Amino acid sequence: MEHVAIIDGQRHTVDAIQPVPGLRVYKHPHRDYGIGTYPVCLGHHEGRRIARTECTADAIDAARDLAEMADWTRSETEIQAAPGLAEKVADYLAGHNAIWAGGYR
């Protein structure tokens, strides 16, 4: 599926998959695969990135786990207003092979 990702304030159309409702996984348009590059993004369906991972499998696993924390089909505004969600997401990502991308904080 096509996904419009917002990266560094710019809109980019990328190919994506949706492993769970509301969350998309796609390759960052300006990062190549390689050790420590974290080129795969996990993002909200409205475009905001949540995390970067080293591979698609890690992003899919993160999406499945984050799906248990919130209804990601809601708007970004509703999700940002959820008490404690940003901290839960950041704590989860810190313990997994992912880099917090600054979304929902």
Model-identified regions with their sequence ranges:
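Short intrinsically disordered terminal tails
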Residues: M1-H3, N97-R105
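A short, sequence-level motif marking secondary-structure junctions
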Residues: I17-P19, C55-I60
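Negatively charged, low-complexity tracts enriched in Asp/Glu with abundant Ser/Thr
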Residues: M1-V20
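A short, exposed loop/beta-hairpin motif centered on an aromatic-Gly-Thr core
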Residues: H45-D58
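Short aromatic-glycine-(Arg/Gly/Cys) micro-motifs in beta-strand/loop hairpins
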Residues: D32-R48
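Charged, amphipathic alpha-helical segments
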Residues: Q18-H28
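Non-catalytic tandem-repeat scaffold regions and their flanking low-complexity/translocation tails
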Residues: R24, I60, D71-S75, I79-A82, ...
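Short, isolated positions in well-ordered beta-strands
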Residues: H12-V14, V25, G47-I50
